[in-house]
Design a protein with these regions (language model features):
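S-adenosyl-L-methionine
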Residues: 218-251
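N-terminal auxiliary segments of SAM/dcSAM-dependent transferases
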Residues: 1-151
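Conserved SAM-binding loop of SAM-dependent methyltransferases across substrates and taxa
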Residues: 196-208
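Conserved SAM-binding loop and adjacent beta-strand
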Residues: 164-177
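Conserved class I S-adenosyl-L-methionine
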Residues: 184-197
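Well-ordered alpha-helical segments embedded in enzymatic catalytic cores
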Residues: 177-184, 199
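Conserved SAM-binding motif I beta-strand of class I
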Residues: 211-216
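Short polybasic amphipathic segments
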Residues: 156-162
């Protein structure tokens, strides 16, 4: 069906179409880099450019990152706009201190322990290895800015592998995406999905939370959590894990 739009509405639609295309393009570029070559830029390369140009290492990384994902900043005005509206506000150098001092990370010990097919260990990000860190930011004009973080040093995080394959982790992204809902938790809390118990841990730490009920359908995960992780929680008596499907439980 053909729509007869006013000139102003036609302009708005054209702008929205352009923004949607740019949202899609930046997501594809980020996904290719993060999935295929996340450690392409090493610390030596970044710091060498920073020293040569007399700029902070974080700025050197962003410049190299732009080139690595295929943006032609000097010659292409569209690419310069992508760098300005997506990469400058969305690709951030992070301090590792808040994540290393997270109460869950400091309380729950993930030594090299094997339990059947499971192994408790640590994964790591290399210096200047970018990763998703937080929910995308939606601007007033419907631009979606992915939040990408990186550290200037190596950073390790709790990890569980299944038959040698990374299965679950507690990364800065988990901390960032759960921060708001943890802050709002109160009373009797119900949550779907156990993970490694990060949300349940932090919710149970709050005095205003009476109980935390977790619905999890993976019985193996529940056993692993009850045997190896839950005993380390200070407020474990507040937590109940039910083996059920979330949709079935809701009905």
């Amino acid at each position: 069906m053909k729509l007869n739009l006013s000139p102003s509405d036609a302009l708005r639609v054209a702008r929205l179409k352009k923004i949607t295309e740019e949202n899609d393009r930046i997501l594809r570029l980020y996904a290719d880099y993060l999935n295929l070559t996340p450690r392409l830029l090493d610390a030596w390369t970044v710091r060498d450019l920073a020293a040569d140009c007399g700029i902070p290492a974080a700025d050197a990384f962003r410049a190299l990152f732009c080139a690595s994902i295929g943006l032609e900043i000097p010659d292409n005005p569209d690419d310069r706009r992508l760098e300005r509206v997506y990469i400058q506000p969305g690709v951030r150098c992070l301090s590792p201190a808040p994540y290393r001092n997270d109460a869950y990370v400091k309380t729950v010990r993930f030594g090299d322990l094997s339990v059947g097919k499971w192994r408790f260990t640590h994964g790591e990000y290399h210096a200047f290895e970018p990763f998703v860190c937080g929910h995308p930011v939606l601007t007033s004009d419907f631009r979606e800015i992915p939040q990408i973080g990186f550290f200037e040093e190596r950073f390790s995080f709790p990890s569980v592998t299944e038959n040698g394959v990374e299965w679950m982790t507690v990364t800065p992204n988990e901390a960032e995406t759960m921060r708001a809902v943890i802050a709002e938790a109160h009373g009797r809390v119900l949550t779907y999905g156990l993970g490694l118990g990060y949300f349940a841990f932090h919710a149970s730490q709050k005095p205003e939370v009476q109980s935390v009920t977790v619905i999890e359908r993976d019985s193996d995960l529940i056993g692993l959590f009850r045997d190896c992780i839950l005993p380390q929680f200070p407020n474990r008596d507040k937590i109940t894990v039910l083996n059920a499907d979330a949709f079935g439980f809701t009905e």
